């Protein structure tokens, strides 16, 4: 074989090798970019944390699409719930949901106390109690009289995670467990945190968390990654998760149409 032919063959082989390698890198880049897309999608609301004064949301507009009727300024939906299930005991949830209507500049919701028992010999039993609340001058107060002084105090002292959480370091979270289903669409990114993480310390400060295990942070959402008023975005700090014991905290801040609020 002549020199020119051997050289041409060498060039062809090298081009093929680079092409194969390039495809691998392209796939890695796409996976990495998907993680970045998820973080950027969540950052649209998480960058607002901490929201010291929730009434500031009356003047804050979120993502709008065709689901909003003309003239509707939208409603912010906030929730924070702590769920605990010690070994051998029932699952208990305590938290709050608040709906801030930007049209009426009023905020109402409810404090929830929920107990769920799952006996293999019986049907799952769910006992839920809701206490209606409203927000006045950035303070949560019960709408109806409450005889239980402990619950009343818990409501009046309640703070949403969005009021003290801070995600300025979100962009620095790396190597998350990424899941994405474009057909649903459903997406998530999970990160192992450390106990010295700011948000973890804030949760331990406010809640009696029995385990010393550092939690995993899960960012999970539905709908178009680029934005959708139909989809949902939730964050979850999971300290313990197994069949015998569960300890996790969930938080959400959504902007939606005011049709149902």
UniProtKB/Swiss-Prot annotation:
It comes from the Bacteria. Keywords: Cell membrane, Lipoprotein, Membrane, Palmitate, Signal. A lipid is attached at residue 23 (S-diacylglycerol cysteine). Transmembrane segments: none annotated. Coiled coil: none annotated. Pfam families: DUF576. Gene3D superfamilies: 2.50.20.40. It is a lipid-anchor. InterPro entries: Csa (IPR007595), Csa_sf (IPR038641). It is found in: Cell membrane. GO terms for cellular component: plasma membrane. A lipid is attached at residue 23 (N-palmitoyl cysteine). Residues 1-22 form the signal peptide. Belongs to the staphylococcal tandem lipoprotein family. This is Uncharacterized lipoprotein SA0398.
């Amino acid at each position: 074989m002549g020199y020119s032919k051997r050289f041409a063959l060498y060039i062809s082989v090298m081009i093929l090798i680079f092409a194969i390698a390039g495809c691998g890198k392209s796939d890695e880049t796409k996976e990495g970019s998907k993680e970045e897309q998820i973080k950027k999608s969540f950052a649209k609301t998480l960058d607002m944390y901490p929201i010291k004064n929730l009434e500031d949301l009356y003047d804050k507009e979120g993502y709008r699409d065709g689901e909003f009727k003309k003239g509707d300024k939208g409603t912010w939906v906030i929730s924070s719930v702590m769920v605990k299930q010690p070994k051998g005991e029932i699952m208990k949830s305590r938290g709050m949901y608040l709906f801030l209507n930007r049209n009426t500049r009023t905020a109402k919701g409810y404090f929830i106390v929920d107990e769920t028992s799952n006996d293999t010999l019986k049907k799952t039993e769910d006992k839920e109690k809701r206490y209606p609340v409203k927000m006045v001058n950035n303070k949560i107060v019960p709408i109806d009289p409450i005889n239980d002084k402990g619950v009343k105090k818990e409501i009046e002292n309640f703070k949403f995670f969005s009021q003290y959480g801070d995600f300025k370091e979100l962009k620095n979270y790396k190597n998350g467990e990424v899941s994405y289903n474009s057909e649903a669409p459903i997406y998530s990114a999970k990160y192992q945190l450390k106990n010295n993480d700011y948000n973890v310390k804030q949760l331990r400060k406010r809640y009696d968390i029995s385990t010393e295990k550092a939690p995993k942070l899960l960012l999970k959402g539905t709908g178009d990654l680029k934005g959708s008023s139909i989809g949902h975005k939730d964050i979850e700090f999971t300290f313990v998760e197994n069949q015998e014991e569960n300890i996790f905290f969930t938080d959400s801040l959504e902007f939606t149409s005011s049709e149902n609020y």
